[in-house]
UniProtKB/Swiss-Prot annotation:
Keywords: Cell inner membrane, Cell membrane, Heme biosynthesis, Membrane, Transferase, Transmembrane, Transmembrane helix. The keyword Oxidoreductase does not apply. It comes from the Bacteria. Its main location: membrane. One of its GO terms (biological process) is heme O biosynthetic process. This is Protoheme IX farnesyltransferase. It comes from Shewanella halifaxensis (strain HAW-EB4). It catalyses: heme b + (2E,6E)-farnesyl diphosphate + H2O = Fe(II)-heme o + diphosphate. Pfam families: UbiA (PF01040). NCBIfam families: cyoE_ctaB, PRK04375.1-2. It is found in: Cell inner membrane.
Amino acid sequence: MPKPIALSRNPSTPLFQWRAYYEMTKPKVVALMLLTVLVGMCLAVPGVVPIVPLIAGMAGIGMMAGSAAAFNHLIDRRIDGLMARTYNRPLPKGRVSIAKALTFSCSLGILGFVVLYVLVNPLTAWLTFASLIGYAVVYTAYLKRATPQNIVVGGLAGAMPPLLGWTAVTGEFHGNALLLVIIIFAWTPPHFWALAIHRRVEYAKVDIPMLPVTHGVEFTKTCIFLYTILLAIACLLPVLVGMCGPVYLVSSTLLSVTFIYKAWQLKFHEEPGMAMKLFKFSIYHLMLLFIALLVDHYLWL
């Protein structure tokens, strides 16, 4: 009986190399980010999004986001190798060399910038470049190691995608787009602090001053709870300015109440693994919130 053919796991094979580069772009994170870009595009126009800024904008922003993620892998390669969550990443494991990782990161970023500049508009290209620098350099290379408020200050770069989507279609700033930025900005600290509680021993081992390491777990739980309340208020802003209708209002209220309740449980009635459960819920919260924005927008056209 013939033996089944097994896929090669030789690091030198093209398939294995491709998977390593793909992993460096943090595809799941970029996918969630692109959802917020798409919502920003759709809310910027009353009807259908023009095809060129839609495709070129999503592609260019996606490439530059992947480039920022790859730079994050490159800069954090030493501490990644010491943490259980990240030790198996391509650079710590030697699946990609430093030189190749740098070449890949730069090439992907440059290609994304050119696509945005030529096919979309210069404003979106430069704003996306600023976001890349904010995440890869300001946050990863400096803030992450400098202050327990790293997530709060550095979160602005990660909150930009809806604005990028908006400018890709309109070519200009708009206050409504900034409201979407505020939502993600308020969402970021409780999202990452929940993970930091779960991984606080590892962060302490590599001298990363995450809030649970520097100020303790109980203080961090309090901050998470307060930020979920702040997030709930931020989520109401699109309704208050007339951007959204009842579908979004009901959806965001249910999501906010659930997030606050789970943060309350973490603070006052913690069970084993509660921080990680909150972290995972926060991902669904953001995803469902922006889907609700999209549904509400087109439902009332």
